[in-house]
Regions:
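Short, small-residue-biased leader/transition segments that mark boundaries at the very start
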Residues: 1-4
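Domain-level detector of nuclease and nuclease-like folds
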Residues: 8-196
Length: 196
C-alpha cells in the first residue's frame, strides 16, 4: 500500500541506487531476513535501505549473525521483544568512493559508519504465560542487552562477555527502552537466564 510507496520514494531520494558500501562493508540488516519469514512480503520489507546499515563484512557474517541466531533460540509462545540499533560514537567514519571495482556509481552517497551495535531483549520468564508484558510483575519478566563495538576481529561465535543490562544500553545511547517495564527488570544482566 501507501506505506511501501512512501518508503520506496524515500529510498530513491536519500539513498540512491549504489552498487555496494565502500570496501569491506555489507548491507547489515537490523531486522534479520531470517526473522521475517511468515510471508514473502514481510521478508521483502527487511531489504529496504531503512533497515540496513554499513557493517564490516566479518562482523556481519560472524559474531552479529551468531547473536541473531542465539536470540532466535529464545523465541516462545509469549512475545519476544527485540530492539536492534546502531550507535555513532566519537570518531565514527564514513564510506564514500563512487566506484565498485572499475564501475562508477554516479548515485553514490556519503554514508556514516556506526561505532557500535546493540540489541535489547525482553520476554516473560516462562515463555507461555499468555500475558502481555504490562500484566506481568517484575519477577515474571527477564531482559538483557548486547553491546558490541563495530570491528572485524571478533571470534565467529557469540560469547556472553558482550551481555549488558538494558539499563547500560540506555545510558550509552540516551534512548529509553520498554518504558512501562520496571527498572529492576532493566537492570538485569543474567546470561544464564537465556539460551546463549
Amino acid at each position: 500500500g501507501d506505506v511501501y510507496k512512501r518508503q520506496m520514494l524515500y529510498q530513491a531520494k536519500v539513498y540512491g541506487e549504489t552498487f555496494c558500501y565502500y570496501k569491506d562493508y555489507s548491507r547489515g540488516h537490523q531486522i534479520p531476513s531470517a526473522d521475517r519469514t511468515a510471508t514473502d512480503e514481510l521478508n521483502s520489507q527487511t531489504f529496504y535501505a531503512s533497515n540496513m546499515t554499513p557493517q564490516n563484512g566479518d562482523f556481519n557474517g560472524g559474531i552479529w549473525a551468531s547473536l541473531e541466531g542465539k536470540i532466535r533460540e529464545n523465541m516462545c509462545q509469549d512475545t519476544l521483544y527485540v530492539v536492534t540499533g546502531c550507535y555513532f560514537g566519537n570518531g565514527y567514519t564514513t564510506t564514500y568512493d563512487g566506484y565498485y571495482g572499475n564501475n562508477a556509481d554516479p548515485a553514490s552517497k556519503i554514508c556514516p559508519v556506526p561505532t557500535h551495535y546493540f540489541k535489547v531483549v525482553l520476554r516473560t520468564r516462562s515463555g507461555n504465560s499468555g500475558k502481555a508484558v504490562g500484566q506481568c510483575g517484575s519477577d515474571e519478566l527477564k531482559a538483557i542487552g548486547f553491546w558490541l563495538e563495530h570491528r572485524n576481529d571478533y571470534p565467529q561465535t557469540f560469547s556472553t562477555e558482550y551481555c549488558k543490562s538494558v539499563e547500560y544500553i540506555e545510558q550509552q545511547t540516551g534512548f529509553t527502552f520498554f518504558p512501562s517495564v520496571p527498572k529492576e527488570v532493566k537492570k538485569q544482566c543474567t546470561p544464564s537466564d537465556w539460551v546463549l
